[in-house]
C-alpha cells in the first residue's frame, strides 16, 4: 500500500500519465464537465475538500509550467486568487481567460477533478511541464 504522495488511485494515475503540455482541471462544485471528459469527483459535502487542499496535493506531485484561470476570479474571489498565486513557482506562466472560455477549454483536458469548493470561480487548468 502506498503511504506517501497522492493516495487516491484515480488522481495518482492521472498525475502519473500526464505528459508535457497535458492539462488537468481542478474545479469547484458548479463547474460543468463536458461529455466524454473523465470526472474525478472528490466532493463529500459543500466545502469539503476545498479547492486549495486539492491544488496543494497536485502542485506537490506534478511539474506545472502554466495555469489558466478565469478573469472573473480577480474581482469575485480575490482571497482565493491570492492564496493560489502564493503557491505557484515564479517560473509558472499565468493566463487569464473569461469564465466561459475556461469552461470551453475543459473540453481538451485529460480530466476534471471536482472538489467541494463553494466559492465563485475556484477553477484552474494546470498545464504539465517537463523535467528535462
Swiss-Prot record:
The active site is at 20 (proton donor). It catalyses: beta-D-ribopyranose = beta-D-ribofuranose. GO terms for biological process: D-ribose catabolic process. SUPFAM superfamilies: RbsD-like. Its EC number is 5.4.99.62. It comes from the Bacteria. Pathway: Carbohydrate metabolism; D-ribose degradation; D-ribose 5-phosphate from beta-D-ribopyranose: step 1/2. Substrate binds at residues 28, 99, 121-123. It is found in: Cytoplasm. GO terms for molecular function: D-ribose pyranase activity; intramolecular lyase activity; monosaccharide binding. Belongs to the RbsD / FucU family. RbsD subfamily. NCBIfam families: PRK11797.1 (NF008761). This is D-ribose pyranase. It comes from Streptococcus agalactiae serotype Ia (strain ATCC 27591 / A909 / CDC SS700).
